Each structure stands twice: as C-alpha cells, then as structure tokens.
C-alpha cells in the first residue's frame, strides 16, 4: 500500500504461471498503457546471448574484438563474459548526477536525446569508446561491477554479428515467446538498430510476461526455448558483486540476482523480479521526479517487496 501510494507510482502487476495474481494502477495510468521499462530491457540480452551460446555460436571467453573488428580500445580486449557481467573498466561512465556524463552523450547518439552537433550513429559512438584515463587495459580492479549501458549495446552488436539475422527479428520472437497481450515497443537509433540497453516499452502485465520467460529458464509460452536453461542456471550461480545498497546482490549476465531470483532495475523507478522456483514474476513501474531521475535508496524497499511476493507462501 505504501509503495503503490507514492506520487511517482505508475503500475504494479504480479503473475504466477498463467494467472494474474495482483495488479494496481495510478489514477492517471491504465492497464493497457505501455510504460518505458528502461534498463530492464537489458534482460533481453541474457536471453539472446544465452541462446546463441547454447547453439555454439558465441564463446563467452572470446574477446569482443574477435567478434567486432571495428570496436575501439574500450572493448577490444574485453571478453564477452566480462561485458555480460558489467565487469569492464573503460572510458564510459554512467553518473546521472553529472550533466556531462558519457551516458547522456550515448543517449544523443542513439536518438534518445537531442545532439548538440552532428548526429552520430549508435555504432559509431560505441566504436569510439576508449580506455579509462591512464588505464592500460579494461580490467576491472574495483571489486564490484561497473554499470555501463554501452555494454548492452556491444552485446546487441555481437548478437547480430553471430546470430545471422537482424536484431529486430529476435525481438519479434521475444514478443511471441512472452505471449504479450499488447505490443512490445522498442526504440531504435537513427539507423533502426534496437536499443536493448533501455528502449523497450511494455504494459505492467506484459512486463511480467517478459520476465516470466527468464523465470521459465528460457522457455516461451509455447514450450519452445527462446533463451537457454543452462545459461540461466549459470546466471543464478555467477556474477560480480554489486555495491551498497545492493551489496547482497550480484550482477550476472545482464541481470541482478541473489541466487534465488533474477531481476533488473530501470532508470526512473522500475524493477522486475522473477522467481524460477515459485513461478511468480512481479513488476513495479514508476517515474521518480528528482533532479537526476535516480536515487539508489529508492530501490531497496521495492526490491524487497517484489522478492518477498515472488517467494510465495
């Protein structure tokens, strides 16, 4: 009641299997209204890369440069696995309290923000990311993950290079695998390349259906695999520590996990959790209205609530 009564609240939904357990909406938001899920979009990269890995088309230990010869020094020697785990140190930063953060330049390149000069493509921007100042490599020596939305776009280019088809076709199949009631909307850059780093928009119910694909360990509603069961099991077991206030979680293969559930947050107040053991998935959508649109202390109560609901009982 407290969290769904906040002035920033948009929608919340919970499903168990094919049953809608709970839903709640703000007075100015409808059940059939799509909402940006921001970085919860990144979980789609887990499903796509996991499928390609299981099919033997991607080696998690190979370098990004081996897959994408055009990539710059910021990713050339990083492995696919390190990019999946946000375990790469380079010249890209994502500090929303800094008006000059690289992430805002990335948004301009991908069409999410007006550019101040020319209109570079997302690929050109990603290719130009270099090493961190003074660094000789991309090794992460911080002891915790280094969150970079550019990592997901790198993985998207990897998926397109090794998948043999356009990324949009993967997203069409994802919509079918989730069994969306409405539509899976996704933003693209100026060249039509889908933005897996944060471009997907779904209703609250359909966000739960999307998360349930991971909760079923990669199976679509028709029982056919879209992601990868062994890859998702490895996701639950692996990962890099996250700093406080999420120190009890790990960042693993484009998800957050505590070894029991899989989830992800989104800029502005979104969070999704799916629990493979109980078959429950819960989504919370909101629009946090402060100076930066982000507050790390806002998320822990939401995460705790969704995790407790998805634990069942």
Question: What are these model-predicted stretches?
Answer:
Residues 1-29, 272-274, 279-283:
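A short, well-structured edge-of-sheet supersecondary motif
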Residues 18, 35-60, 83, 155-159, ...:
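Active-site SXXK
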Residues 54-96, 161-198, 202:
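Active-site helix/loop module of the DD-peptidase/beta-lactamase fold
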Residues 138-147, 195-201, 264, 270:
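Solvent-exposed loop and edge beta-strand segments that line ligand/cofactor-binding
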Residues 150-158, 198-219, 270-287:
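Active-site-proximal alpha-helical segments within enzyme catalytic domains
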Residues 294-313:
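Short, gly/Ser/Thr-rich active-site loops of penicillin-recognizing serine hydrolases
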């Amino acid at each position: 009641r407290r969290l769904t009564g906040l002035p920033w609240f948009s929608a919340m939904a919970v499903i168990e299997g094919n049953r809608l357990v709970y839903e709640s909406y703000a007075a100015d938001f409808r059940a059939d209204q799509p909402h940006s899920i921001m970085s919860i979009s990144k979980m789609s990269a887990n499903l796509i890369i996991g499928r390609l890995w299981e099919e033997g088309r991607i080696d998690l230990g190979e370098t990004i440069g081996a897959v994408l010869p055009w990539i710059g020094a910021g990713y050339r020697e990083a492995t696919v696995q390190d990019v999946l785990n946000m375990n790469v140190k380079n010249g890209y930063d994502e500090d929303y309290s800094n008006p000059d953060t690289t992430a805002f330049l990335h948004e301009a390149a991908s069409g999410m923000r007006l550019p101040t000069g020319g209109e570079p493509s997302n690929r050109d921007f990603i290719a130009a990311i270099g090493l961190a100042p003074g660094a000789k490599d991309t090794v992460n020596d911080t002891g915790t993950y280094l969150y970079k939305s550019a990592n997901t776009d790198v993985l998207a280019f990897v998926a397109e290079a090794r998948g043999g088809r356009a990324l949009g076709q993967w997203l069409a199949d994802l919509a079918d695998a989730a069994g969306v009631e409405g539509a899976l909307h996704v933003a693209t850059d100026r060249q039509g390349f889908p933005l897996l780093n944060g471009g997907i928009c779904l209703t609250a119910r359909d966000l739960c259906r999307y998360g349930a694909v991971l909760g079923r360990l990669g199976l679509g509603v028709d029982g056919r695999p879209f992601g990868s069961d062994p890859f998702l099991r490895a996701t639950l077991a692996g990962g890099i520590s996250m700093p406080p206030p999420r120190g009890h979680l790990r960042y693993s293969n484009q998800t957050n996990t505590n070894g029991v559930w899989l989830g992800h947050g989104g800029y502005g107040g979104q969070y999704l959790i799916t629990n493979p053991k109980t078959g429950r998935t819960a989504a919370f959508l909101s629009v946090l209205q402060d100076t930066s649109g982000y507050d790390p202390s806002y998320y822990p109560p939401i995460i705790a609530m969704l995790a407790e609901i998805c634990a069942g009982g």
